[in-house]
């Protein structure tokens, strides 16, 4: 039964992430990169400066840095640790190349999303800011396109409830905790007859995680932002430090690893023994898992950007852009290099977080238990903040769909918390396939909007920097 369902999901995933969507996402990023004159290179130093510098006397609910941390809390998660591993194992080392290439173009995409979110945001009757693709589709493209805005919002709820927001994150947390405390599944319990047996560590993790998530979500966006501002920078620095140590310890192997990555991206037969189709798999998995990780083109980050305290759309666009740089070009690259350098992607029988754990155990000059513990800690907190960020995103999507009915949002919040509870009991492959499917469906209406509104982005950008000069 489960194998039939899994095969069906894989076929749907391959259809959604076929050539048309891949071309749409890459071409959209390329178009914006060209029209903005490589803005992601020219203005990156300024963007990094503004990332930590608050704007005075600006409208909004939270600071630009808090908005970025909220966005990063939703992006830096299992995608950086587990997603990279699954991409490299499925598509070969070449998947890492396409992940970084998509992220470079995605920086222009993320900039455009942040700019449009602030430009077209509105203020709700209770005073909180509302914005995102559904508003810039409706207001920027016109009322005739409201159906596209609703389609985006619907898939946004699905991604939060079944994809990035819950199942993949809590599944990753449970796998990491189980791998550290009970790797041999020696202590199992039976929850329900149809669920089978699960390690006690998985059961306890699901209970504790559910309680912690519920405690934070009840406080709304400001509590989510407060938690994210503390947790995200600290854990990102910790993970960066340990991954960097691994790279430095294997620095002599880096040229060979880069050669393998680039070669596999274009002629994967030499690496995987595949044909031309294998190159497409590398591109498919690299782009899909890259979007899972950095969310450029997905349309989620502009929902948080709309709440930022800023009066300049361009400024928030630049701050939003740094999220993709930090998430994929820095953190995912470190993870991918670690996996390739240690050969973890070639070890049979490993999947998901086990691949990255193996890489850390083999590549770091510390006892395996220490390496595993650090990775588990990073994954738990990364995934926890992602769960929080995606609840905010999906609630705003539902708020738009329901015409501002906050009663529906409150009911949804408890359904979301229940989804967190059941996530650990799903299989790794099913979790990631479902996430990929809904990501693609959510990205489609957003990318159509970015193509249509690219002229607005260029006009706003030129006007802003002309005023600054």
Per-segment meaning from a language model:
Residues 13-46, 89-128, 148, 327-334, ...:
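Extracellular loop-to-transmembrane helix junctions
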Residues 1-78, 88-95, 106, 421, ...:
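N-terminal alpha-helical transmembrane segments of multi-pass membrane transport
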């Amino acid at each position: 039964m489960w194998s039939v369902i899994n095969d069906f999901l894989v076929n749907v995933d391959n259809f959604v992430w076929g050539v048309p969507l891949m071309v749409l996402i890459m071409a959209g990023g390329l178009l914006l990169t060209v029209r903005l004159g490589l803005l992601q290179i020219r203005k990156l130093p300024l963007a990094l400066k503004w990332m930590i510098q608050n704007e005075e006397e600006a409208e909004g609910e939270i600071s630009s840095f808090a908005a970025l941390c909220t966005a990063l809390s939703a992006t830096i998660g299992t995608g950086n640790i587990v997603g990279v591993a699954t991409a490299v194992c499925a598509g070969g080392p070449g998947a890492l190349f396409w992940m970084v290439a998509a992220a470079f173009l995605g920086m222009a995409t993320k900039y455009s999303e942040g700019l449009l979110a602030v430009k077209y945001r509105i203020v709700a009757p209770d005073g909180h800011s509302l914005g995102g693709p559904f508003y810039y589709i409706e207001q920027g493209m016109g009322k005739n396109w409201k159906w596209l805005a609703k389609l985006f919002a619907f898939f946004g709820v699905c991604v939060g409830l079944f994809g990035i927001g819950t199942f993949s994150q809590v599944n990753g947390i449970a796998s990491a905790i189980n791998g550290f405390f009970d790797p041999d599944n020696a202590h199992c319990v039976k929850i329900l007859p149809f669920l089978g047996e699960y390690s006690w560590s998985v059961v306890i993790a699901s209970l504790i995680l559910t309680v912690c998530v519920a405690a934070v979500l009840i406080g709304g966006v400001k509590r989510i932002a407060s938690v994210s501002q503390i947790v995200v920078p600290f854990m990102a620095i910790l993970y960066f430090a340990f991954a960097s140590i691994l790279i430095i310890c294997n620095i002599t192997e880096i040229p060979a690893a880069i050669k393998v990555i680039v070669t596999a991206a274009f002629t994967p037969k030499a690496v995987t023994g595949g044909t031309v189709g294998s190159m497409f798999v590398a591109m498919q998995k690299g782009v899909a898992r890259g979007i899972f990780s950095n969310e450029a083109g997905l349309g989620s980050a502009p929902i948080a950007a709309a709440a930022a305290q800023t009066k300049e759309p361009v400024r928030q666009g630049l701050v939003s852009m740094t999220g993709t740089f930090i998430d994929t070009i820095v953190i995912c690259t470190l993870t991918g290099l670690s996996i390739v350098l240690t050969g973890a992607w070639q070890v049979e029988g490993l999947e998901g977080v086990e691949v990255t754990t193996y890489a850390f155990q083999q590549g770091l000059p510390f006892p395996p238990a220490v390496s595993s513990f650090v990775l588990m800690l990073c994954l738990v907190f990364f995934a926890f903040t992602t769960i929080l960020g995606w609840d905010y995103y999906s609630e705003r999507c539902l708020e738009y769909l329901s015409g501002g009915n906050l009663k529906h949002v409150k009911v949804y919040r408890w359904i979301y918390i229940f989804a967190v509870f059941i996530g650990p009991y799903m299989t790794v492959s099913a979790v990631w396939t479902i996430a990929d499917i809904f990501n693609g469906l959510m990205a489609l209406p957003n990318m159509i909007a970015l193509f249509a509104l690219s002229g607005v982005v260029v006009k706003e950008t030129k006007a802003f920097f002309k005023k600054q000069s």
